[in-house]
Amino acid sequence: GIGTPCPQGQGHETVFAQFAADMWQVPMEDVFVTVADTGQVTQGYGTIASRSTVTASGAIKIASDTVQEKAFTIAANMLEASETDLEMRDSGIGVKGVPDIHVTWRDIARAAKPGWDNQRPDGVEAGLESTSYYEPPTVTWAYAANAALVWIDAETGQIDIEKYVEVHDAGLLVNPGLADGQVIGGLVQGLGGGLLEELAYDDQGQLLTGSLADYLLPTASDVPPIEVIHMETPSPLNAFGVKGLGEGGAIAPPVVIANAVCDALRPFKAELS
């Protein structure tokens, strides 16, 4: 099982399960991911820095390495073999080159239990679990470049975005579908902030856009064709080469649209202020 930061649709549960399934060589359906209980979390810094994949993957690896080291010790005792002769395979541990000599993770967990009938070597504590903390040496650096093609109605000033492109480098893509979804979702949010959304007040200071009937969020009909191009430059600062990708889409669009509008109006020598 894995505890996770509170997600808001990023796909934490899927990505963290992918890391664990790969490290333990088990099907993803055998991995259980639990969302952190905010009433019991002793440290919480908010949803910032696009860091969940970086920090959680590091913690999953440290915890997995710790538990697997113990699991190999117990499996060696169960199979009467040297740890150096063992390998992970088939949702468990087996003797290299001998397919029939094998124990599953379930077998090893049972062998690690407390009690007189356990199969732990002398000096090995009961249980097969670990709580680990990952403290990266510094932040990772993700990069993105955005461009928009806009059309402006000369009579009304209406702005239409004909195409929007983002090139994004988030290191290793653990799940390309989720990566696309998060970047595109951020772009839509950024487009809304740049063109539609406004906290409007009257001259008495009363909020005029206090409901979704008045505060214009982008809908499917407002979203232009979006192209996301992923580059994969692994980060050297963590074991998997991952980086965050939650901010490039949301931050850039207002500035990109403003620059595109200025460029379109260049023949008229108009200035955007």
Short names for language-model regions:
Residues Q18-S273:
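C-terminal catalytic domains of large/alpha subunits in multi-subunit enzymes
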Residues G1-T4:
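Structural motif
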